[in-house]
């Protein structure tokens, strides 16, 4: 058995342990309860609403129409690419498909996440330790929140849980798209100024298209970071690199355009009141300025100031933190991602007159800052204190 196979088996075991516990405990308490009711009871509070959307989409019903007396006249504008995989197999397994896909997609999320941090840290031992430690940290926070009423735990948990948990559909589905984007960007970056296989642009384009439809706010930060990083990384050679990979960039452009067009079509042909019933609202230019001021004030929150200060200190002290030169490019990408997460909401406000759940932008800010600092911290901890004491791979 080679390292990659062993690597995959470890992720399978980790996934099974994390997801099966709730079902095993439930069966030990109430063995006779049907698995169908366990799926409903052990899921998040909004699961049933999303499950009904999946059932509707599986029958090619984009109206998600549940009322006989008051049928919908147009389609709904909810992001269908976050449901598409569940809808594809719903007719085969019904509600039991949610269990199968919960295990499979969470495995895929952990697997791709590990691939991403292996790229960044260039060491499978450190990467696997980073993954396990992060999962343990998240589970510990959830446990403490269930037993102690500590507000600061909620502030720590939220950005992690919104990007790295098995809640359906976000982040169970959307984070697979997100980390796929990071992975394929890193594959392209690795080539330096040389020809990149078009398949990486194709896969990156599909990942972008799916994320644009499923979690538009996060896709803005991803796209903005990609553009900024290519400019800063390749500098004067940027046009040479684009010309060298022109067909790949054309593929990427049209797939991103496809993702944007799905949102446009859904918005154009959807029920006009659905957006407002989901908590959205229209804003004027004056209200945009007011929202921008609120975002600016948030910069002075203690946790945000700490993330900014530590991120810049890390960026300026790579050598002292024992980050190898060959790995610094990938850490830089995470640093720029953190910076772009501050700019993304302003760009969105500039072009959009409709907003909904703007707090998701701030979730991205907190997660990206934490993610950058966390990986540097684990790299430093492992190389200085744990490298000869812990072996996760062999």
Map each language-model feature to its residues.
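Membrane-interface alpha helices of multi-pass inner-membrane proteins
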Residues: 199-216
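Active-site lumenal/periplasmic loops and adjacent helix-entry segments of GT-C-fold
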Residues: 20-179, 213-220
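Short aromatic-rich membrane-water interface segments that cap or initiate transmembrane helices
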Residues: 42, 157-170, 284-302, 363
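Hydrophobic/aromatic-rich transmembrane helices and adjacent perimembrane loops
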Residues: 220-222, 354-385
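Transmembrane catalytic cores of multi-pass membrane glycosyltransferases
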Residues: 46, 213-326, 332-335, 339-346, ...
């Amino acid at each position: 058995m080679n390292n990659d196979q062993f690597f995959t088996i470890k992720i399978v075991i980790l996934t099974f342990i994390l997801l099966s516990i709730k079902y095993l405990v439930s069966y030990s308490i109430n063995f006779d309860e049907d698995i169908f009711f366990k799926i409903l009871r052990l899921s998040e509070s909004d699961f049933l609403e999303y499950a009904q959307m999946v059932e509707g989409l599986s029958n090619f019903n984009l109206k998600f129409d549940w009322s006989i007396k008051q049928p919908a006249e147009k389609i709904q504008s909810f992001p269908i690419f976050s449901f598409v995989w569940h809808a594809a197999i719903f007719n085969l397994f019904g509600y039991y498909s949610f269990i199968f896909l919960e295990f499979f997609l969470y495995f895929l999320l952990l697997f791709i996440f590990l691939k991403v941090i292996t790229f960044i840290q260039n060491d499978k031992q450190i990467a696997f330790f980073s993954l396990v430690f992060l999962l343990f940290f998240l589970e510990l926070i959830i446990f403490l929140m269930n037993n102690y009423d500590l507000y600061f735990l909620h502030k720590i948990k939220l950005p992690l849980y919104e990007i790295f948990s098995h809640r359906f559909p976000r982040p169970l589905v959307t984070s697979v798209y997100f980390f796929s984007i990071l992975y394929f960007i890193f594959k392209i970056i690795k080539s330096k100024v040389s020809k990149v296989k078009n398949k990486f642009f194709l896969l990156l384009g599909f990942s972008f298209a799916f994320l644009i439809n499923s979690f538009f706010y996060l896709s803005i930060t991803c796209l903005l970071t990609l553009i900024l990083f290519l400019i800063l990384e390749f500098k004067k050679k940027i046009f040479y690199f684009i010309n060298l990979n022109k067909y790949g960039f054309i593929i990427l452009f049209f797939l991103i355009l496809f993702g944007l067009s799905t949102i446009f079509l859904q918005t154009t042909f959807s029920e006009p009141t659905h957006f407002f019933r989901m908590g959205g609202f229209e804003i004027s230019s004056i209200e945009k300025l007011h929202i921008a001021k609120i975002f600016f004030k948030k910069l002075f929150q203690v946790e945000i100031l700490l993330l900014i200060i530590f991120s810049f200190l890390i960026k300026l002290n790579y050598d002292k933190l024992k980050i190898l030169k060959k790995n610094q490019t990938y850490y830089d990408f995470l640093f720029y991602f953190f910076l772009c997460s501050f700019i993304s909401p302003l760009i969105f406000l500039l072009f959009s007159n409709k907003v909904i759940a703007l707090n998701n932008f701030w979730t991205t800010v907190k997660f990206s800052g934490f993610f950058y600092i966390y990986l540097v911290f684990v790299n430093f901890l492992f190389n200085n204190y744990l490298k000869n004491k812990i072996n996760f791979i062999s």
